[in-house]
Structures are given as structure tokens and as C-alpha cells.
Amino acid sequence: MVDFKTYFELLNLYSDYAMVCDSANWEKWPDFFIETGTYRLQPRENFEQGLPLCLLALESKAMIRDRVYGVKETMYHDPYYQRHIVGTPRVLSVERDADGERITAEASYAVIRTKYDGDSTIFNAGYYRDVIVRTPEGLKLKSRLCVYDSEMIPNSVIYPI
């Protein structure tokens, strides 16, 4: 599958992604994606039935940057902290071709949300289904599909999952 060095890079990609989201360092979020990278948030029921409807579908790094602008400048909401708990990634496949190495991996996640004046609750849980490619800057997401378990989300999704 993958050698230890590559797997260690994969672990760092997942943990660094979670830390950027948890520290609200939104400007760094797009850096995890290649220019044509996609980010989608989809209910498990739709995914398992092959239905394309997503709660959120960002089709390029430019759209991901626009989302960052929205989070920082235009969206009004009760502020909250979030904490990602991400399982160890499981490598599903590795392909090598003229464009380089492409890893398909998945990892379970839970996002805990804490309102400044309230309790901590599980906001979203599911798994990431990722396609990761090697670039001169290291491993980057070609696509991140967040498949969440519940059909309903208790409130709007503001921050990245």
C-alpha cells in the first residue's frame, strides 16, 4: 500500500487539517487542497443511495477561499468553538500514473461544538472519504467528501467539518 514515510505524511495531513479547523485559522484551510480540489458535505443516506445532493459542495480551491471569506466577513451566527476528533486514516487504494501518486483514504470523525456560554455537544459525526495527491508542497486533498451520519444537522454549518 504505502510506505511508512507516506503514511506518516498522511497522518500529519489529517491532524494538521483538524488543528487548523479547531484553531479557527480559516486562511490556512484552502492550503490543504489543490487548485481543482473539491470539498463536499453529504448525508450518508444520499451517499449510500448514489444520490448527488450535498448540503455543501465547493468545486474548486477558489470556492473554498470564498467560503473562508464568508465565514470571516459575512456570516452572522452565535460564535462557537469546535473540536475535531479524527480516527486513524485507512488507506483504501494507491494508484501511480503519469500524474504521480493518488491515495484514496477514509477516516471517521466527530466534531464537538461548544458555545461560549453553553455545553459541549456532538455537532456532526461521520467519515471523510478523501482522494489525496502528492505535490511539490507535500500531500494535498484532491477531494474531501464528508459523509455525515445523521439526516439532519442541528443548526447551520458555518465552519469546515
Swiss-Prot record:
GO cellular component terms attached to this protein's record: catalytic complex
List the pathway annotation.
Answer: Aromatic compound metabolism; naphthalene degradation
- What catalytic activity is recorded? salicylate + NADH + O2 + H(+) = 2,5-dihydroxybenzoate + NAD(+) + H2O
Pfam hit, one: SnoaL_4
Q: What is its EC number?
A: 1.14.13.172
Which superkingdom is the protein from?
Bacteria
- Please describe what happens when the gene is knocked out: Cells lacking this gene are not able to convert salicylate to gentisate.
Q: Which UniProt keywords apply?
A: Aromatic hydrocarbons catabolism, Monooxygenase, NAD, Oxidoreductase, Plasmid
GO-annotated biological processes: salicylic acid catabolic process
One Gene Ontology molecular-function label: salicylate 5-hydroxylase activity
The entry's function note states: Oxygenase component of the salicylate 5-hydroxylase (S5H) multicomponent enzyme system which catalyzes the 5-hydroxylation of salicylate to gentisate. Active only on substrates with a ring-substituted carboxylate group with an adjacent hydroxyl group. Primarily active against salicylate and substituted salicylates, but not against 2-hydroxycinnamate, 3-hydroxycinnamate, 2-hydroxyphenylacetate, 3-hydroxyphenylacetate, 2-hydroxybenzophenone, 1-hydroxy-2-naphthoate, 4-methoxysalicylate or 2-hydroxyacetophenone.
Q: How does it assemble?
A: The salicylate 5-hydroxylase (S5H) multicomponent enzyme system is composed of an electron transfer component and an oxygenase component. The electron transfer component is comprised of a ferredoxin reductase (NagAa) and a ferredoxin (NagAb), and the oxygenase component is formed by a large subunit (NagG) and a small subunit (NagH).
> Family per UniProt?
Belongs to the bacterial ring-hydroxylating dioxygenase beta subunit family.
Could you tell me what this protein is called?
Salicylate 5-hydroxylase, small oxygenase component
Q: Which gene encodes it?
A: nagH
